[in-house]
């Protein structure tokens, strides 16, 4: 089982692999109980945003056995949230 930090770094790598921009992994455990890390990235189009999110889901499933607890905004494609409990991935 991966730590929250390891999951956040895996998500950041998955975003980088698909050319995500402005990628940041922010430790927020001391600030809120929502998650331990927020992972943020931007994409250049709705299509790229969906590709970024798909790759995060693929990598976290294959390398950590993790599935998102919740996914929001995927159909709209302008902002997507993946909630993994200990990390939240935001792609704009």
Question: What annotation goes with each model-predicted range?
Answer:
Residues 1-34, 43-80:
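Polybasic/polar functional segments that serve as interface/processing modules
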Residues 81, 90-92:
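C-terminal structural segments of small proteins and small subunits
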């Amino acid at each position: 089982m991966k730590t929250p930090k390891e999951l956040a770094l895996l998500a950041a790598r998955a975003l980088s692999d698909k050319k995500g921009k402005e990628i940041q992994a922010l430790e927020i455990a001391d600030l809120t109980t929502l998650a331990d890390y927020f992972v943020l990235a931007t994409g250049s189009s709705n299509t790229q945003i969906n590709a970024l999110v798909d790759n995060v889901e693929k990598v976290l499933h294959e390398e950590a056995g993790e599935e998102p607890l919740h996914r929001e905004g995927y159909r709209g494609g302008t902002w997507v949230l993946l909630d993994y409990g200990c990390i939240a991935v935001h792609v704009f």
